[in-house]
Every structure is written in C-alpha cells, then in structure tokens.
C-alpha cells in the first residue's frame, strides 16, 4: 500500500502565513489537514436494552440510528422492528434519529416496549399491499384471457369481411366469454394505478363486444341472403324436372301406338281424334227438367 505523504504549504491569511493546514494525499491532491485523524472513525459501544423484565446487551456503532437498533433487537425480543418503540431517558426516540446525537453512550440504558398502534398500522398496510398484489395478479390473468379471445375476434372479423359465414352460436359464445371477463373486472376493488389498469381492460373488453355485435348483424344478413337463394333454386329445378318427366311419359306412350299402326298397314298412320263438345248450359237444363218419380205402392185394406 502507498503511504500517505504529508507536507505543509504556506497559506496567506491576513497577510501572514500559517503552517500545518494543508496535506498531500497519495494521488497528489492537496487538502486541508484534519485536526484529529481519528475523529471521523465511528466508535462501537455496548448498550443495555430492557424489554419487560429481561436485559439485553447490544454492541452497536455509535453513529447508528434507533431504527437499526430495533432491527438488531427484533430477533432477541421476538417483535417486528416496526412494532416496537425505544425509550431513552423516558422519552420515545424516532427510528430516524442517531444514537450519538441523542447522547447515547457506552453502557447507556434503553427501554423497548411494544407499540400496538404501530403494529395495527403495519398489519393494515400489509393487508392493503396484499389486496393490491392480488388485484394486480387478477387483472394480469384477465388481460391474458382477453388477448386469447381477441385473436378469435380478429379471425371471425376476417372471415365475415371476406364474404364468408360464421355460425351464430360461435359468435354468441365468444360474446358470453367476454362478458364473463367484464364481470370479473367489475368485481375487482382497487385504487391508484391498479384502478387505472382495470379501467383500461374494461374499455378493451367493451370494444371487442361491440365489434362482435356488428359482426353478428353482418353474419345474419348474409345468412338471410343465402336462405333466399337456396329456397328459389330447388323450385325451378323441380318445375323443369316435372316438365321433362311429363314429356318423357307422353313420348313413351306414343311410341307403342305408332309401332302398332305401322306394322298393320305398312304405311305411316295418321291419328285423328274426334272431340265431342258438350254444352254446359244444356246439361244444366237437362238436370233441372228431370223430376223424381214418386214410388207406387199397393196398399191392402183390412176390415
């Protein structure tokens, strides 16, 4: 190790010189000489701490704070360092205060007591932090689930915008799953940043639900158009099929007749049909002139 070289350099103060006020450090820097070389070295002393009826001796640095002393006593007295208060000269000392500045010396006596108010505050803060952590974890899980459902929304949107058709049941199920996530978000009670995170996720889920409602309307309109086209198409087919069937039957009936006539005469036969005309008015009058004939019975009389 390099040894520190000390030297003196004159300094003019009030027109005169004063020696032994400057010293040279190993790096060549000239600084003001310290009056006491060991004045900045912290001193370790032993203090006696009473908790209940038991005394504990603690070796601690003189420049330590009362908070550090509480942490050292925590394992020995069995209390959390935030649940205790330290008294010195019958006065409670703050955890941020230093021992030497408060007059604590070697073999000084301190008293430690349990602080129920601080304990209650610590437990409340612990519960609050646990609730915040739980809410944050729940929101993270919901966000992950919403990301997964958002992929399905994008897929349905692509299919419908390209002219395809999606089952309505699939859209309804996806809307229900998003609404379940919205109910989970509404059940979370949070403040501050966690509340802002919850609000962002709620707005996100609502946006996806609205998009699915629009896709549902488009999908229903396309379904109606497809049903109309399918309903008209079979009717035209059956009409043409019936017409073809009748023409086929007539041709089948005419072929045997033509073959029989040609075989008997040897010449092509001409079929002449005689149609008898009936007058609907004359038939109605004939029906009116016909009267029912009363029956004739032979009656035999007895005396």
From Swiss-Prot:
- A Pfam family hit: BAG
- What are the cysteine partners in each disulfide bond? none
Q: Where is this region: Disordered?
A: 1-27, 249-268
**Could you give a GO molecular-function term held by this entry?**
protein-folding chaperone binding
Q: Which residues form the Ubiquitin-like domain?
A: 45-119
What does the UniProt keyword field contain?
A: Chaperone, Phosphoprotein
GO CC terms on record? cytoplasm
- Asked if the keyword Chaperone belongs to this entry, the reply reads yes
Which residues carry the post-translational modification Phosphoserine, per the record?
Answer: 263
**Skewed-composition ranges (Polar residues):** 1-11, 258-267
The residues covered by the BAG domain are: 138-216
Q: What is the recorded function of this protein according to its Swiss-Prot or TrEMBL entry?
A: Co-chaperone that regulates diverse cellular pathways, such as programmed cell death and stress responses.
Q: How does it assemble?
A: Binds to the ATPase domain of HSP70/HSC70 chaperones. Interacts with HSP70-1.
Query: Can you say what this protein is called?
Result: BAG family molecular chaperone regulator 3
Report the source organism. Answer: Arabidopsis thaliana
Q: Which gene encodes it?
A: BAG3
